[in-house]
C-alpha cells in the first residue's frame, strides 16, 4: 500500500521533471551550474564562519569522538566478518523483516482512526479503573 502511494507520487513528479528538462528553459546548464556553485560556496563560507567560532577544546573533543567512532565501526566489521556465512545471512534476513515491520507500524501509529480507537480504549480502561 505504501509502495503504491510512493510510486503514485514519485512517477508523476519524475515525468514532469523530465518533461521540464526536455523543454526550453530560461537557464542553460552553465547558468544552473553557476547558481549551484554560488550557493554551494555560500554554504561553505557560512560553515567556515561558524566553525571559526568553535573553541579549540571542542574541536579536539569532536576529533577524538570521530576517531573513536571509526575504531568502533572497524571493530563491528571485524566481528561481523568473524561470523559464519549462515549467521551473516540470518542477520541480513532479520534486517529485511525489521524494515518490513517498521513501515506498517508507522502507518498504524499515524492513522487517525487507529489513534481514535486507542484513545477510546484507554478511556474505557480508565473508566473501569475508577469503578
Swiss-Prot record:
Disulfide bonds: none annotated. Keywords: Cell membrane, Coiled coil, Lipoprotein, Membrane, Palmitate, Signal. Residues 102-131 are annotated as: Disordered. The keyword Cytoplasm does not apply. A lipid is attached at residue 18 (S-diacylglycerol cysteine). The lineage of its organism: Bacteria, Pseudomonadati, Pseudomonadota, Alphaproteobacteria, Rickettsiales. Residues 1-17 form the signal peptide. Residues 113-123 have a biased composition (Low complexity). It is found in: Cell membrane. GO terms for cellular component: plasma membrane. The keyword Coiled coil applies. Residues 57-102 form a coiled coil. This is Uncharacterized lipoprotein RT0080. A lipid is attached at residue 18 (N-palmitoyl cysteine). It is a lipid-anchor.
